[in-house]
A protein has these predicted regions:
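Helix-loop element at the rim of GNAT/NAT acetyltransferase active sites that forms part
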Residues: 19-35
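Active-site rim helix/loop that mediates acceptor-substrate recognition in acyltransferases
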Residues: 30-58
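Conserved GNAT acetyl-CoA-binding A-motif
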Residues: 112-125
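Conserved acetyl-CoA-binding loop-helix of GNAT-fold acetyltransferases
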Residues: 97-114, 135-136
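Conserved acetyl-CoA-binding loop of GNAT-fold acetyltransferases
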Residues: 135-145
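Conserved acyl-donor/pantetheine-binding loop and adjacent beta-alpha core of acyl/acetyltransferases
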Residues: 56-89
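A short, internal acetyl-CoA/4′-phosphopantetheine-binding micro-motif in the GNAT/acyltransferase core
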Residues: 86-97, 124
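A short beta-loop-alpha structural element at the N-terminal edge
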Residues: 4-20
Length: 161
């Protein structure tokens, strides 16, 4: 990243942008944000266990990565267990392929480590180009569901179980 590109922590003020990023993450399946079951990934943002980072280019947000803890009775798509936060990541189409996804993922995994998490999980389409990025960061498949793979990455120096 150059001096005009940066990563910063997400805040409650970023919820509208996180909702926009859900459109980019899920546009292929649902037509409008209100019909996206994924809105659970930002509803009530700021609760314990929520953390995220925003990529900026020339001062404008162009991508986001965040995680949230889910309960067994209300899981996310990549749910593994109640102690493992589930990650969501998206970059606006015009900025893809420029390293933002890698920078976002690196920053968010560093944050998860610093907060003491041992693992993070996610769900990805089997044919998604992002699958290779996740594998480079140590994510491994734990189960397959329809056309998706639930993946988990172990984080060094996380809190013990």
């Amino acid at each position: 990243m150059n001096e005009l590109q940066m990563i910063r922590r997400a805040s409650r003020a970023d919820v509208p942008f996180l909702r926009d990023m859900l459109r980019h993450a899920y546009y292929w399946r649902w037509g409008t944000l209100d019909s996206i079951p994924g809105t659970r990934y930002v509803a009530g943002w700021g609760r314990p266990g929520d953390a995220g980072v925003i990529a900026l280019d020339l001062g404008f947000p162009v991508g986001a990565a965040w995680y949230r803890l889910f309960r067994r009775d209300a899981p996310g798509y990549g749910f593994v267990d109640e102690e493992t936060p589930e990650l969501t990541i998206a970059v606006v189409p015009s900025r893809r392929g420029r390293g933002f996804g890698e920078q976002l993922l690196s920053a968010l995994l560093d944050r998860a480590r610093s907060e003491g998490y041992r693992d993070v999980s996610l769900s990805v389409e089997r044919d998604s180009p992002a699958l290779k990025l996740y594998e480079r960061f140590g994510f491994r498949g734990v189960r397959e569901e329809d056309d998706t793979v639930v993946m988990r990455a172990e984080l060094a120096n996380g809190r013990p179980s």
